[in-house]
């Protein structure tokens, strides 16, 4: 069971299908029909919920946590909640794998790394992994309008302003995967620039 804007759900559903497991994906109803169709084609049971902020108990992430707990009580085989936002194995995989691949494929000639944030696992994990090799590498955040991270890392204020058409990117809280991250640069990217 996972709450996702689609991408992680697609990956989890693909793996679940391969191993013969059932996947249940809780997704905001505002996500693209293409993602929803891909999830259904992979055999996922799709639970669409209204888009709500994380503070709302019916936010798709919180809803998926409750659903996993309920299914775990009644299912013969149990249920597992992936919890991509706060499961630090997400970040760990990027420390141990993604950052090492980047380092090896650039022959160590990398001055910096920049990406946007969904769960925070990629940015924080690659940051840690690259800085373990050489601490002077620069790390940047490319944050869409509507996300709170740009203001948090530039002004110390965790506050969302505006909106964006990007799906699954932008964060309104410091996830466990983001804890301790201190990017060297933060950029607020408007939709016009991103597209």
Task: Place the predicted regions along the sequence by residue.
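Glycine-rich phosphate-binding loop signature in dinucleotide/nucleotide-binding domains
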Residues: 71-79, 102-109
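Generic beta-sheet signal
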Residues: 26, 49, 84, 140-142
